Amino acid sequence: MTLEIKTSNVEPIRQNYAYIERRFGSKPATRYQEVSFDVQAETNFHYRPLWKPEKTLNDKTHTALQMQDWYAFKDPRQFYYGTYVQHRARLQDTAESNFAFFEKRQLAEHLSNEVKAKVIECLLPFRHVEQTANLHMMSGSAYGYGTVLTQACIYAAMDHLGIAQYISRIGLALDGNSGDSLQQAKQAWMQHPAWQGLRRLCEESLTEQDYFKLFLLQNLVIDGFVTELVYQQFDQWLVSQNARDLAMLTEFMKDTLGDLRKWSDTVIKTAAAESDHNKQLLNEWFTESLAQVKAAFTPWATAALTVDAVDQAEQAVIERAKKLGLQPLTNA
């Protein structure tokens, strides 16, 4: 008896969806491409937004920025919901492990009263700044154009909400979960002179209607100052005060802000390279935002660190902006 085994190849009729093929050609698409590109509705809207009847749903004119292709703002991390959740779950697992270790070893008892007081007064109120950052990025998700940008903005909004929650957890770790530290931090936020510039910045920024101006303000300038002043210089002060154990509780914040920078830098650089109009507009926004944020952080930096700390943070932000094709205007 002879047994013959025949094989045949099955060729798919289509490699991908039609909307993906129009952009990328007839080839297999990644999951990020399938859920991110050209999926936002553009026509046949049944009504205008009741809150802004002069606009349409998914309107490109919510920002003065102009793009030939709004899907040019692709995420280098290629985050869609599944990959984003998996990545952040790993960061959260590490953070939870760090907090559990801190509490199990009762490391808060080794901190001096001076350090605890300064952390409560100078670090914990940043949870309000992060809540504002959450709203800033919500604006990008609500009014932005193109799913590649809007989905990444909502992820960033959730990141800032997570940072705010972990800052609150630091307070609870210091006061034995009584919540007293959070009440003290709230009073500092509402009344201490060092915080009033940042309070004003947060409140006034929420009236801004251009979502991309908020994007630049938050991701380049505010996050730049926070990273340099809070998670570098203030962290170094903690080390000098034998409070290096607190550094493990801010690891989530540093890792998350570093990851957000990979994405936001790409978006800003792409926008600046699009046209001279965009570059001029972004430079004007950057110049305005840099002055506002520096003025807002100066009282805090003077109280928490040194007089020249805010100048170092400003220089770090300017150097970062130069790599993106931006610089402050000298005549502004």
Swiss-Prot record:
Induction: By phenol. Pathway: Aromatic compound metabolism; phenol degradation. Keywords: Aromatic hydrocarbons catabolism, Monooxygenase, NAD, Oxidoreductase. GO terms for molecular function: phenol 2-monooxygenase activity. Coiled coil: none annotated. It comes from the Bacteria. This is Phenol 2-monooxygenase, oxygenase component MhpL. It comes from Acinetobacter pittii (strain PHEA-2).
